[in-house]
């Protein structure tokens, strides 16, 4: 088992992980060609590895299989994108939300191909332009 942060991205139709994560897990990888469309490129072909991953929440209460996760050298998010407890504590309407801290990078991007992972369980709506938040099975 490896601990990492996951970026839940409903704007992506595919899930991705870092090459480094697949290596640390010793995951079985299969070569494939990936067609990526972004705001700056359309149908850009790229060699990738596809893996099957099983993810669980920090307490191990919920586990879901992600059957087609594409491996990339890096993901378009950084450690600075990870919310911290001090961020949440700034707003009273977010009271009761606990963000666990782990010593890890963001090595998994979960797209809308994993709808159960993205499914909202609780929504804290934005007030006066400050952040809103969504709780899922995974936090």
Language model segments and positions:
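Aspartic protease
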Residues: 1-139
